[in-house]
């Protein structure tokens, strides 16, 4: 007879090859048809909520690897929580207002001058929705489960309505005010410009080095030095109020031509060369931070210029001492706010100097350059004048140069709530811990928040003006505008006159004649997304504020984490989140930033096309995502190899359960053979470790633990020796059923454990588990596995861990014999061991299983370790002799034994196989 027919070889339709790029979309289609998101929500209804609030990506362009990392991390957490006792809704969002969309339309050839603001905004909205639909499909392809049909979108009427309420609440508390801030200003078109309305062209400008005499050295300088600044805008010198230095840079006091000057050490050589200093002596070196609060004198006005510290100071050019005019520069303004400097802006809207620049009033700023340079020369402050050609911002419409000029803007006060903000930070859990220090320092040091923008595409600032120009913000106007936006969307602001946006019959003391105008500025987009705690968490029934977790890239400490905190504390006095987790950036394999010019961009869509989403998700689980992470073809190849091993382990287990029904064939757990109970204990440890790692967001541990469990515990040990029993023994053999019981428990538990990370593969395994006890149609509809109680667990672990060490010794000896060509496969070997006393006791207790456990044909426990023959390999706990086994090879189980052929009916079989065949396969 053909003995092959009597072997119980693995049978499963679970394919060896993942073929994920083809199979994943089929699995996703099944999820969609099942409406899996709804099913999960229904199943977990009534459980405690766990809300991970999605930070909205900007609706523009295809998703990049940073998006993929972010969304996959969120999805892993949400999937785990919904399998471990929580109801975990996930509502994805999109950020849709702002400059990039305006710019994208302009690039597409939209001529905004030929249409009304309302018409242009309709095109912006249309474009945003196109981008959302594109990104939504890409996010879904990653396997991210969420309420994709009901996302939150910052341009939706209900969102804008809530945002207006946030603004109104802040205004009511006195946190919204008007103040000055420098913006791009075009004297030629007499208006503020957005960055999108700027184009860079070459311009010839004066380049001057100016000396500011020290007035009070604060014990750091002697008082007879001069601080040297460099600028290409002499017209801003009348507005100078400070000199900025970098706190961490070295500065030097140098003596030349009988005078002492202060410059950055790193720039001394270039400054000396430029000004023409011959012999220079370094008098002393000082850190920038030690120069803070030194007082210098303005070169030609009777006022002070304070030395301040600023992180924006560089050593790229100039002197390292930066002329600071808060009315004429973004950095100057921000650092000036920190030090409480005035915002002096002696230039009018047409670009002419005002009376705040005595001596230069009435001069066009460009002409003032010459007059001011002459004045500096007269007072002996000009060290060098030359001319340079450099790239300079111009008005894209008039093609004329722009200037930075302080204009009136709307602000949200951070100062008034700084204490509450810092307290809220303390009450929040920050992961990693350095996140707390980072955001604490940002909030501690930040100035007030400029929330107005002179653009078209955004949420209008809901302010009206009376006849005397006084701003009007009342509970009544806010409520009315919020309701209008909820009904019509914010475009209504641009379609109606002020009177038609106010409540009927509205009156105000500032407008005796009932004439009102409206604000035309819009809100900063960070105010949009920063209001999501109210516009999403409070607005929607399935969510709650505060969220349990915000999870974004580390750039969001200054972005969304910050703006959300500011608006939430302003409105509720509390943070909008209980915990904040941040991840790093995605770099290439060499640790370089990805860029088109370097050609090192790895695109998620490409990876999914070639390898599949589960490989990308496994990569996310493999990296230390709290720092910057690396990705490349070779890194993905390594991950794909780990995936292959995990998949093959699943396949082996599934294949060997084809004739197993847990209801009828399972062996009670405490009746399992000891080695099988040991594997259950190993499985218990895996379950505990993996669940703990999910709880602490430590996915890399899961990656390593699952990989080790599959390759070391299962493939290299348990499954390896189990084959002999699974394939060879009779179907109902107790040892075989014992192993199958372990395989069943393992495959079910392992599928659940990896489901949050590898949802497609887990789903596929789930479908292929024969006679599954849990009838749920998806692995997403069950909970994480529980550990299985085993009697005398500690004793089993101690004994079998010791055996595994012994096994390593014997395997080493087998490897040596194989390399020396003494044996071929291990089944051709006969092993004799000379154990130590402890080892003898251990081996003696499992003597009858040793041949199977070591996959050899003969295993003998001989004399004590001390009496081992000379030629034995001496290892830690045993001395080992390996020789070829004597006898014939059994045709059915391949064991080598002299007893082959003892049964005349089956001359090529060993007695064990002959017995099995006679009992179970004879006609």
Swiss-Prot record:
Q: Tell me the GO BP annotations in alphabetical order.
A: isoleucyl-tRNA aminoacylation
EC number(s) stated in the UniProt entry for this protein: 6.1.1.5
Q: What catalytic activity does the UniProt entry give for this protein?
A: tRNA(Ile) + L-isoleucine + ATP = L-isoleucyl-tRNA(Ile) + AMP + diphosphate
Cofactor dependence: Zn(2+)
Tell me if Ribonucleoprotein is a UniProt keyword of this record: no
Where L-isoleucyl-5'-AMP is bound, by residue?
552
Q: Which GO terms describe its cellular component?
A: cytosol
Residues annotated as binding Zn(2+): 890, 893, 910, 913
The entry's keywords: Aminoacyl-tRNA synthetase, ATP-binding, Cytoplasm, Ligase, Metal-binding, Nucleotide-binding, Protein biosynthesis, Zinc
Gene Ontology terms for molecular function: aminoacyl-tRNA deacylase activity; ATP binding; isoleucine-tRNA ligase activity; tRNA binding; zinc ion binding
The answer to whether the entry has keyword Cytoplasm is yes
Which top-rank group of organisms is this from? Answer: Bacteria
Segments crossing the lipid bilayer: none
List the InterPro entries: aa-tRNA-synth_I_CS (IPR001412), aa-tRNA-synth_Ia (IPR002300), Anticodon_Ile_BEm (IPR033708), Ile-tRNA-ligase (IPR002301), Ile-tRNA-ligase_type1 (IPR023585), Ile-tRNA_ligase (IPR050081), M/V/L/I-tRNA-synth_anticd-bd (IPR013155), Rossmann-like_a/b/a_fold (IPR014729)
Motif position, 'HIGH' region: 57-67
Q: Give the subcellular location.
A: Cytoplasm
Which residues does ATP bind? 596
| Broad EC category | ligase
Just give the chief location class.
cytoplasm
Under the heading HAMAP family, the entry gives: Ile_tRNA_synth_type1
Q: How does it assemble?
A: Monomer.
Q: Give the protein family.
A: Belongs to the class-I aminoacyl-tRNA synthetase family. IleS type 1 subfamily.
The free-text domain note is: IleRS has two distinct active sites: one for aminoacylation and one for editing. The misactivated valine is translocated from the active site to the editing site, which sterically excludes the correctly activated isoleucine. The single editing site contains two valyl binding pockets, one specific for each substrate (Val-AMP or Val-tRNA(Ile)).
Q: Briefly, what is this protein's role? A: Catalyzes the attachment of isoleucine to tRNA(Ile). As IleRS can inadvertently accommodate and process structurally similar amino acids such as valine, to avoid such errors it has two additional distinct tRNA(Ile)-dependent editing activities. One activity is designated as 'pretransfer' editing and involves the hydrolysis of activated Val-AMP. The other activity is designated 'posttransfer' editing and involves deacylation of mischarged Val-tRNA(Ile).
PANTHER family in the record: ISOLEUCINE--TRNA LIGASE, MITOCHONDRIAL, SOLEUCYL-TRNA SYNTHETASE
**Listed name of the protein:** Isoleucine--tRNA ligase
């Amino acid at each position: 007879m053909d003995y092959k027919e009597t072997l119980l070889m693995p049978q499963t339709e679970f394919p060896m090859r993942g073929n994920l790029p083809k199979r994943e979309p089929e699995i996703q289609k099944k999820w969609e048809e099942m409406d899996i998101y709804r099913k999960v929500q229904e199943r977990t209804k009534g459980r405690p909520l766990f809300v991970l609030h999605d930070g909205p990506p900007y609706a523009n362009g295809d998703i990049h690897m940073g998006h993929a990392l972010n969304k996959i991390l969120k999805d892993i957490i949400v999937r785990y929580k919904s399998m471990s006792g929580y109801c975990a809704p996930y509502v994805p969002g999109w950020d849709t207002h702002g400059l990039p969309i305006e710019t994208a339309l302009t690039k597409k050839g939209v001529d905004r001058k030929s249409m009304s603001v309302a018409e242009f905004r309709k095109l912006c909205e249309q474009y945003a929705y196109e981008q959302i639909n594109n990104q939504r499909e890409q996010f879904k392809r990653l396997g991210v489960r969420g309420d994709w049909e009901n996302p939150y979108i910052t341009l939706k009427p209900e969102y804008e309505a809530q945002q207006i309420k946030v603004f109104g609440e802040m205004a009511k508390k006195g946190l919204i005010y008007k103040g000055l801030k420098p913006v791009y200003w075009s004297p030629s078109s007499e208006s503020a410009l957005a960055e999108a309305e700027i184009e860079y062209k070459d311009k010839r400008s004066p380049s001057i080095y100016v000396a500011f005499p020290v007035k009070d050295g604060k014990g750091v300088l002697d008082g007879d030095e001069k601080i040297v600044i460099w600028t290409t805008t002499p017209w801003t010198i009348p507005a100078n109020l400070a000199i900025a230095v970098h706190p961490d840079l070295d500065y030097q006091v140098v003596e030349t031509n009988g005078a002492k000057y202060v410059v950055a050490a790193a720039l001394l050589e270039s400054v000396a060369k430029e000004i023409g200093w011959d012999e220079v002596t370094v008098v002393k070196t000082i850190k920038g931070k030690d120069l803070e609060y030194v007082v210098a004198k303005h070169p030609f006005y009777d006022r002070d210029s304070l030395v301040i510290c600023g992180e924006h100071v560089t050593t790229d050019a100039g002197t390292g001492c930066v002329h600071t005019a808060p009315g004429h520069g973004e950095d100057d303004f921000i650092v000036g706010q920190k030090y409480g400097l005035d915002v002096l802006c002696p230039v009018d809207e047409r670009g002419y100097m005002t009376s705040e620049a005595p001596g230069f009033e009435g001069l066009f700023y460009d002409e003032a350059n010459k007059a001011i340079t002459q004045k500096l020369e007269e007072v002996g402050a000009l060290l060098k004048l030359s001319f340079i050609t450099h790239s300079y911002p111009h008005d894209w419409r008039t093609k004329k140069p722009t200037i930075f000029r302080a204009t009136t803007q709307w602000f949200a006060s951070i100062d008034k709530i700084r204490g509450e903000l810092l307290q809220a930070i303390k009450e929040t859990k920050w992961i990693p811990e350095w996140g707390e220090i980072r955001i604490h320092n940002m909030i501690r040091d930040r100035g007030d928040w400029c929330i107005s923008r002179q653009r078209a595409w955004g949420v209008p600032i809901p302010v009206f003006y009376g006849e005397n120009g006084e701003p009007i913000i009342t509970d009544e106007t806010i409520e009315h505008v919020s309701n209008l936006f909820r009904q019509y969307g914010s475009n209504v602001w641009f379609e109606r006159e002020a009177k038609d946006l106010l409540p009927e019959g509205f009156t105000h003391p500032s407008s005796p004649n009932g004439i009102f105008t409206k604000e035309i500025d819009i809100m900063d987009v960070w105010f949009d997304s920063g209001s999501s705690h109210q516009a999403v968490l409070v607005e929607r029934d399935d969510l709650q504020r505060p969220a349990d977790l915000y999870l974004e890239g580390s750039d969001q400490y200054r972005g969304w984490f910050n703006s959300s905190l500011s608006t939430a504390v302003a409105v509720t006095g509390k943070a909008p989140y209980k915990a904040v987790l941040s991840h790093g950036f995605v770099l290439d394999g060499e640790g370089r930033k990805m860029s088109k010019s370097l050609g090192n961009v790895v695109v998620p869509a490409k990876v999914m096309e070639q390898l599949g989403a589960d490989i990308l998700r496994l990569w996310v689980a493999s990296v230390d995502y709290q720092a910057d992470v690396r990705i490349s073809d070779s890194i993905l190849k390594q991950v794909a190899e780990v995936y292959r091993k995990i998949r093959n382990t699943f396949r082996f287990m599934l294949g060997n359960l084809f004739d197993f029904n847990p209801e009828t064939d399972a062996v009670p757990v405490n009746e399992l053979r000891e080695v099988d109970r040991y594997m259950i204990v190993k499985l218990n440890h895996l379950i505990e470790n993996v669940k703990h790692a999910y709880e602490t967001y430590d996915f890399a541990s899961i990656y390593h633990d699952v990989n080790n469990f599959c390759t070391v515990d299962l493939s290299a040990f348990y499954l390896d020796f189990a084959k002999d029993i699974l394939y060879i023994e009779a179907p109902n053999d107790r040892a075989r059923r014992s192993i199958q019981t372990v395989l069943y428990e393992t495959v079910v538990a392992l599928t659940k454990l990896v489901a949050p990370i590898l949802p497609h593969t887990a789903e596929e395994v789930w479908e292929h588990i024969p006679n599954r006890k849990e009838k749920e149609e998806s692995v997403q509809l069950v909970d994480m596995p529980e550990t299985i109680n085993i009697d005398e667990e500690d004793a089993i672990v101690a004994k079998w861990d010791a055996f595994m060490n012994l096994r390593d010794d014997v395997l080493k000896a087998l490897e040596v014999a194989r390399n020396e060509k003494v044996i071929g496969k291990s089944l051709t070997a006969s092993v004799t061991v000379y154990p130590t006393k402890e080892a003898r006791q251990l081996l003696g207790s499992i003597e009858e299983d040793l041949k199977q456990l070591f996959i050899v044909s003969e295993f003998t426990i001989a004399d004590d370790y001390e009496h081992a023959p000379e030629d034995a390999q001496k290892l830690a706990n045993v001395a080992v002799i390996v020789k070829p086994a004597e006898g014939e090879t059994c045709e059915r189980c391949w064991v080598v034994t002299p007893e082959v052929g003892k049964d005349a009916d089956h001359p090529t079989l060993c007695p064990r196989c002959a017995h099995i065949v006679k009992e179970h396969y004879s006609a």
